[in-house]
Amino acid sequence: MKFLDQAKVYIRSGNGGAGAVSFRREKFIEFGGPDGGDGGRGGDVWALVVDGLNTLIDYRYQQHFRAKTGGHGKGRNMTGEKGNDIILKVPVGTQIFEEDNTTLICDLTEVGQRYRLAKGGNGGFGNLHFMNSTNQAPRRANPGLVGEERTLWLRLKLIADAGLIGLPNAGKSTFLASVTAAKPKVADYPFTTLYPHLGVARIDAREFVLADIPGLIEGAHEGVGLGDRFLGHIERCCVLFHLISAQEEDVAKAYQIVRNELKAYGNNLSDKTEIVAISQIDTLTLEERKVKQEVLQRVTGKSVMMFSAVSGESLEAMLRAGAHMIEMVRKEGVDRDVRTD
């Protein structure tokens, strides 16, 4: 299934049904009086979170949604039936914005959660409502009220426990494929990953959801390479795995580029717990590993892990560190920098 994390939709709730003009006509009842029923209420438009979805691709092919008009009132004081609702099924983590794509309407984070986006118009009054002491046989009724019409943006922010960040070709997809059942595209060229992937990692009877987002470049927070869209997917993560490729000549610069983008993007991304790790160490000698690790530790002020997804070296240590930090963040409600021996 193709991935789409943003979509524009046009919705309209149903109009209310018209009230009826009707009079009671029965044998032996000379003056039956009015008995026109009210119109039914128009259908609503709802957003509903369902399980098993992780994309908004359906809304690329259908953008217009209109609920049904309420039924018209009938004689014998019968109210028209309510118009059928329209339900927009969305994945967990969907945010819905006004047409300006800035004003947040709702943030849907749990399966089964729903939100009414547009309320159907009320039905019109039948002629029974207009009877009074001076008008015993009113011949008027109200039309139903018009439904609401809105243009909305749907934006998906994946819900994961930990996120993988780094420059293109930092080995994020290879790491995800090695520790989960996810099958992201892996190749020896930049920007192999074009959209986020999710996988479930397991270690020591513990498990957590891991999100791999496409590589970040300078200017990502301003939308360069769609970086601002990708950064949104890690806003909900407890922990960030910041991977730096062992093949980078200047590992400190590679680290700082991504850190600068996190700070510029805002939303407290730069304050999240960070596990810094050098990937692809199977390409280095022991001496080269030591040099790059020491350089990064001086720049970050943190212990720096090293691993190889190809050889499997230190993969379990990475997962244990991630699982431990996720538990710590959840328990304490604060972010802490990882410390490894």
From Swiss-Prot:
NCBIfam families on file: Obg_CgtA, PRK12297.1, PRK12299.1
Species for this entry: Bartonella quintana (strain Toulouse) (Rochalimaea quintana)
Main location: cytoplasm
HAMAP family on file: GTPase_Obg (MF_01454)
Single GO biological process annotation from the record: ribosome biogenesis
Oligomeric form and interacting partners: Monomer.
Keywords: Cytoplasm, GTP-binding, Hydrolase, Magnesium, Metal-binding, Nucleotide-binding
Protein family per UniProt: Belongs to the TRAFAC class OBG-HflX-like GTPase superfamily. OBG GTPase family.
Example of a GO cellular component annotation carried by this entry: cytoplasm
Occurrences of domain Obg (ranges): 1-159
Residue span, OBG-type G domain: 160-327
GO MF terms, alphabetically ordered: GTP binding; GTPase activity; magnesium ion binding
Required cofactor names: Mg(2+)
Residues the entry annotates as binding GTP: 166-173, 191-195, 212-215, 279-282, 308-310
Chain sites annotated for binding Mg(2+): 173, 193
EC nos: 3.6.5.-
Function: An essential GTPase which binds GTP, GDP and possibly (p)ppGpp with moderate affinity, with high nucleotide exchange rates and a fairly low GTP hydrolysis rate. Plays a role in control of the cell cycle, stress response, ribosome biogenesis and in those bacteria that undergo differentiation, in morphogenesis control.
Class of enzymatic activity (EC top level): hydrolase
Compartment(s) where it occurs, according to its Swiss-Prot or TrEMBL record: Cytoplasm
Protein name: GTPase Obg
